[in-house]
């Protein structure tokens, strides 16, 4: 199997990070949620998860240099007043590492943790190898005790070749244990196993085989509804209410056939970060799905930290994609026409 060593390292890293995040979520208080410079929420789990994954990848793949494109950095952890927070993060990191026998004697200092977090400052690109990480994707859901993902992917020469995603709050259909670990390698299919690593072997996942769009289900965020989604659903004749899920867990739900359509249309000028889509995209693609922009072009992860695409992200099955793209084009044209009419009034 290609990238066998990398996949094993990624699964170990993500599993340990998920363990850390679960411990934080169990005892999380609103006072534990901080704001970054861009006003988005961040918790000890975001920093701790990134530190664990950075440390495990560096150790498991030594002597290969680690280039990590990740959401967090340790800038705020160097500021006055951050020492107590950093100390709690360091304790979480060491507890998570100690839960794995091969890391039982691997104790990190506060400075080690900051350095591990700051490995995530790589800019990615079209050459070399870059790991892409969202240490806690869906922090808003995480702080409410709801779904979130720990999402890691490997970019080689500008192409995503491997993805691992922990979904600690997603029900496992094949096991009584909670939590799922999804993984995929290019050309090898997508799989899911229990996050707790029980005796059940990994199961191959496949997207839904529904051919009639009227029978399809949207998967959407738990935030407010987006009007264009309703327009597209009406054109396809979809009657079922959407499945509401936070974060990249939406990709996982679609990959195993829980839903058939995931759309992401953001405000004009917003640029998508690659760590919000890389792992989910390859898992869904390897499960037989299609991930593209609203023009039907594949997503390009080789342009640095951001995706360079024109309009929206569209995820669905091969059966439904042609009719879905047609409905999207018609809905966008109608929206533009309505905007032009309102401007003239």
UniProtKB/Swiss-Prot annotation:
Pfam families: Inositol_P
Binding site for Mg(2+) 2: 134, 137
Protein name: Probable 3'(2'),5'-bisphosphate nucleotidase 4
Protein's UniProt keywords contain DNA-binding: no
Pathway in which this enzyme or protein is active: Signal transduction; phosphatidylinositol signaling pathway
Binding site for adenosine 3',5'-bisphosphate: 139, 247, 250, 264
Catalytic reactions on record: 3'-phosphoadenylyl sulfate + H2O = adenosine 5'-phosphosulfate + phosphate; adenosine 3',5'-bisphosphate + H2O = AMP + phosphate; adenosine 2',5'-bisphosphate + H2O = AMP + phosphate; 1D-myo-inositol 1,4-bisphosphate + H2O = 1D-myo-inositol 4-phosphate + phosphate
Main enzyme class: hydrolase
Organism: Arabidopsis thaliana (Mouse-ear cress)
Protein's GO biological process: sulfur compound metabolic process
Residues annotated to bind Mg(2+) 1: 71, 134, 136
Coiled coil regions in record: none
Active site: 46, 139
MF terms in GO: 3'(2'),5'-bisphosphate nucleotidase activity; inositol-1,4-bisphosphate 1-phosphatase activity; metal ion binding
Family membership noted in the UniProt record: Belongs to the inositol monophosphatase superfamily.
Function: Phosphatase that converts adenosine 3'-phosphate 5'-phosphosulfate (PAPS) to adenosine 5'-phosphosulfate (APS) and 3'(2')-phosphoadenosine 5'-phosphate (PAP) to AMP. Is also able to hydrolyze inositol 1,4-bisphosphate and inositol 1,3,4-trisphosphate.
Chain residues that bind Mg(2+) 3: 71
PANTHER family reported for this sequence: PHOSPHATASE, SAL2 PHOSPHATASE-RELATED
Swiss-Prot/TrEMBL cofactor(s): Mg(2+)
Positions with a binding annotation for AMP: 247, 250, 264
Enzyme nomenclature, EC number: 3.1.3.7, 3.1.3.57
């Amino acid at each position: 199997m290609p990238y066998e060593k990398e996949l094993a390292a990624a699964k170990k890293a993500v599993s340990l990070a998920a363990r850390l995040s679960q411990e934080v979520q169990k005892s999380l208080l609103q006072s534990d949620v901080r704001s970054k410079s861009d006003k988005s929420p961040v918790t000890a789990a975001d920093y701790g998860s990134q530190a664990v994954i950075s440390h495990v990848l560096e150790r498991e793949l030594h002597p290969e240099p680690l280039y990590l494109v990740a959401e967090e950095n340790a800038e705020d952890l160097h500021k006055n007043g951050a020492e107590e927070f950093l100390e709690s993060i360091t304790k979480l990191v060491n507890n998570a590492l100690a839960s794995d026998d091969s890391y039982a004697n691997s104790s990190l200092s506060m400075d080690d943790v900051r350095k591990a977090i700051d490995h995530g400052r790589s800019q990615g690109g079209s050459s070399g190898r870059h790991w892409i990480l969202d240490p806690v994707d869906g922090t808003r859901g995480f702080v409410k005790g709801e779904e979130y993902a720990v999402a890691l992917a490997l970019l080689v020469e500008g192409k995503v070749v491997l993805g691992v995603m922990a979904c600690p709050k997603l029900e496992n259909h094949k096991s009584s244990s909670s939590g799922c670990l999804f993984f995929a390698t290019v050309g090898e299919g997508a799989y899911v196993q229990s996050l707790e690593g029980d005796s059940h072997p990994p199961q191959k996942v496949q997207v839904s085989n529904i051919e009639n769009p009227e029978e399809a289900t949207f998967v959407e965020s738990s935030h407010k509804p987006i009007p264009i989604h309703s327009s597209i659903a009406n054109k396809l004749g979809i009657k079922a209410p959407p499945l509401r899920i936070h974060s990249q867990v939406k990709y996982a739900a679609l990959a195993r056939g829980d839903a058939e359509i995931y759309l992401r249309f953001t405000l004009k000028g917003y640029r998508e970060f690659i760590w919000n889509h890389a792992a989910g995209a390859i898992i869904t693609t390897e499960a037989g799905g299609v991930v593209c922009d609203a023009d039907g072009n594949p997503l390009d992860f080789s342009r640095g930290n951001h995706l360079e695409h024109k309009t929206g992200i569209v995820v669905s099955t091969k059966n439904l994609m042609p009719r879905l793209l047609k409905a999207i084009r018609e809905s966008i044209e109608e929206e533009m026409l309505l905007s032009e009419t309102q401007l003239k009034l």
